[in-house]
Structures are given as structure tokens and as C-alpha cells.
From Swiss-Prot:
Gene3D superfamilies: Farnesyl Diphosphate Synthase
Alphabetized UniProt keyword annotations: Lyase, Metal-binding
Organism of derivation: Dictyostelium purpureum
Reactions catalysed, as given in the entry: geranylgeranyl diphosphate = beta-araneosene + diphosphate
Motif DDxx(x)D/E motif: where in chain: 90-95
Family assignment from sequence similarity: Belongs to the terpene synthase family.
Gene Ontology molecular-function annotations: metal ion binding; terpene synthase activity
Function: Terpene synthase that converts its substrate farnesyl diphosphate (FPP) into several unidentified sesquiterpenes. TPS10 also converts geranylgeranyl diphosphate (GGPP) into the diterpene beta-araneosene.
Gene from which the chain derives: TPS10
Protein name in UniProt: Terpene synthase 10
Pfam families documented for this protein: Terpene_syn_C_2 (PF19086)
PANTHER family: TERPENE SYNTHASE (PTHR35201), TERPENE SYNTHASE 1-RELATED (PTHR35201:SF2)
EC number of this enzyme: 4.2.3.-
InterPro entries named in the record: Isoprenoid_synthase_dom_sf, Terpene_cyclase-like_2
Motif window: NDxxSxxxD/E motif: 232-240
């Protein structure tokens, strides 16, 4: 697969995606990654000497330290399980390609595992890990915080079911491209940021689940989801071109719309402007949301929730730039051509010691 239209020059992602600098936060400790990997080994998902799998999990889970920077170890461990579950199911469904019957069956079984805590296919490690993850969430919440638990399970199920239609909106036909409005509607949920934010209601007990019903907050969260999905598409664009699976990447399929775009630069400008407009919308809506609450303590809780959204936005961007696995063969954007040398994950050398 090749890029359809030629660009004029390398484009800087750090200059193209704009958000307030004060949203950045130093990542928290990443020691939880080893513990998450150990849990997976104990469940038979990975082998202790499987360096390739550890590298993959290490790369995925290192994002947690950036997107949930205020977490202590037990909270970080929960974010690690959350992200690991997300990648496990996403990768498994991708491996099924276009087997509709198998895909639907898998989604139904995982839905049962999330809602009922039961395993339908006794040979499914995915279902086993889903039940393990669900049980850990319930233990963390307890019955006194069942509303937070139900909130997250509900959002996970909704996100789960978007994986199927999302895989159907692309085609390898040369002139086909999906409706961007349709893509954006599904991707708002599919990118998983709404579920990521729902996890905060479990991790941080000061957050009131009633805030989830506030329409202005949900608007902010939806805007954040689209901004993050555009960032992810930009970062993964070259790798997906190389692997010939960029059909659902906006930076790829919008180039096919010759009625709107004649160059790759125009596509980039359009998407960067949309992402930055959504950041401006968030900045505009935040004081309006805070103004809805007269009590000072209530405002502090709302601000805390907004800060968590900030960290999802900034953490995703910074981690994406730093993550070594996303630098390969990227010839379209600068800032992704080489590693900064910063270590963002755990070390393979620590595993043998950890498993003693």
C-alpha cells in the first residue's frame, strides 16, 4: 500500500496538534507492568520466557503511566489490566479477519463474561482474562460502589460492540472510501477514551457517577475522543501504510475524496484543524460546566474529573511520540523519526527477578 497523494514536506506533529501545556503531567511509576505480565503468565496467556510478548505488553501498558499519571500502584495495576484486556480483544478480533460468524460469537461470549462473569468457551483465554479483569474491578469497587462498576461495564460492552461495524467500514477497492461522518460516529466510541474515562470513577472515589449524565461533560468527552483518534491515526499512518492495513485511517481514506482534497497536505490540514477545534471547544465548555455547580467542593470534584480528561489527551499524545514501536518507517511526520531515548516501559532484565 502506498500513500495516494504526495506531500510537500515532513509535517511536525508537535506543532500541528495544539493543547494547553499545563495539561501535561509527569508519568507515574511503571512497575505495575511486570505484575500485569505475571498475571497473564499465570493465566497461561503468555510464557515467562516470551520476550516478544513481553515487549508488546510493555509497549502497550506503558501508556497507562502517561494517561493516568496520578495513580498509585494499585490504581496503576487496574489501568494496566484495562489496557491489556483492550489490546487482547482488539488483536484477537483482527486475527479473525472477515469471519463474521466467529467474530459475532466472540463478541457475544466476551459480553457474557463482562456482564455475568461467566466463561462460555472453556478454551478461550480471552474470556478467562475478561472474567479475571471483571472480578478485579468488582473487588476494587465493592458493593458500596456498584454504580461505578456498572458504569464501566456498560461502557466496555458498548465499546466492544463497535469493534464489529468498525471493521466493516473499509474496503480494499481502489476507489472506495467510507463516509467520514459515519467513521467519526463509530470511532468516537471505538477509540475507547469514553471507557478510559469511566475507569476513573472506579479509581478515584471522590468522583460522583452522576457527573457522567451531564450533557456538557459528555460533549467534552466526545470531543476528546475524536481528537485522540486523529492523533492515533497520524502516529500510526506510516506503519499502517507499510503493513497495508490503513483502510480505516483517516489520513489515508480521506485522500480518496478528490472532491475535497487534492494533496496529502490538505488532508493533514483538515484533520489537524478539526482536532484543534475540538480542543478549543473543550476549553470553552469547561468553565461553563464548572459554573453549573455552586458548591465549592462540587466544583473541585468537577475540576478533578476535567483534569483526568486532560491527562488522557496529553498522555496519549506524549506517549505516542515517545513510544519506540511507532517510529519505524515513518516518513510522513517528523517527531516520529527517532526515539528520544527516554525509557517509557519496564525492563526485560527485571522479569526473572520479579518471578522468583
Amino acid at each position: 500500500m502506498e500513500a495516494i497523494k504526495q506531500k510537500r514536506s515532513l509535517i511536525s506533529l508537535k506543532e500541528s496538534f495544539i493543547y494547553p501545556h499545563e495539561w501535561n503531567h509527569e508519568p507515574c511509576d511503571n512497575k505495575f507492568i511486570l505484575e500485569c505480565f505475571k498475571e497473564s503468565v499465570n493465566l497461561g496467556i503468555f510464557q515467562i520466557d516470551d520476550k516478544k510478548s513481553f515487549s508488546y505488553i510493555n509497549s502497550c501498558l506503558s501508556s497507562c503511566a502517561y494517561m493516568w499519571p496520578l495513580c498509585n500502584h494499585s490504581q496503576s495495576l487496574m489501568t494496566g489490566r484495562f489496557i491489556q484486556w483492550s489490546f487482547l480483544i482488539d488483536d484477537y478480533l483482527d486475527s479473525l479477519e472477515i469471519d463474521d460468524k466467529k467474530t459475532d460469537s466472540t463478541v457475544l461470549n466476551v459480553e457474557k463474561a463482562l456482564i455475568n462473569g461467566t466463561i462460555t468457551n472453556k478454551n478461550s483465554k480471552l474470556e478467562e482474562y475478561t472474567v479475571f479483569f471483571r472480578n478485579k474491578l468488582f473487588e476494587y469497587c465493592g458493593r458500596e460502589r456498584l454504580d461505578a462498576f456498572n458504569l464501566l461495564i456498560n461502557e466496555l460492552v458498548i465499546c466492544l460492540w463497535t469493534l464489529v461495524p468498525f471493521s466493516k467500514i473499509h474496503s480494499k477497492e481502489k476507489d472506495f472510501y467510507p463516509s467520514y461522518q459515519l467513521y467519526r460516529c463509530i470511532r468516537t466510541i471505538n477509540v475507547g477514551i469514553i471507557a478510559c474515562c469511566a475507569l476513573n470513577f472506579i479509581l478515584f472515589k471522590d468522583l460522583d457517577v452522576k457527573l457522567w449524565l451531564n450533557p456538557r461533560f459528555r460533549k467534552i468527552l466526545n470531543r476528546a475522543s475524536i481528537q485522540i483518534s486523529i492523533v492515533n491515526d497520524a502516529v500510526s499512518y506510516a506503519k499502517e501504510i507499510l503493513n497495508e492495513n490503513a483502510y480505516c485511517n483517516t489520513f489515508y481514506f480521506l485522500q480518496k475524496d478528490s472532491t475535497k482534497f487534492s494533496t496529502f497536505d490538505q488532508v493533514c490540514e483538515y484533520l489537524f484543524n478539526e482536532a484543534n477545534t475540538y480542543i478549543k471547544d473543550i476549553i470553552t465548555d469547561e468553565p461553563l460546566l464548572l459554573h453549573e455547580f455552586e458548591d465549592v467542593e462540587d466544583r473541585k470534584v468537577v475540576q478533578s474529573l476535567l483534569n483526568h480528561v486532560h491527562y488522557l489527551i496529553s498522555g496519549n499524545f506524549v506517549w505516542s511520540i515517545e513510544n519506540n514501536q511507532r517510529y519505524q518507517s515513518n516518513i510522513y511526520f517528523i517527531n516520529l523519526l527517532q526515539s528520544t531515548g527516554k525509557s517509557i516501559g519496564s525492563s526485560w532484565s527485571n522479569i526473572k527477578t520479579f518471578f522468583r
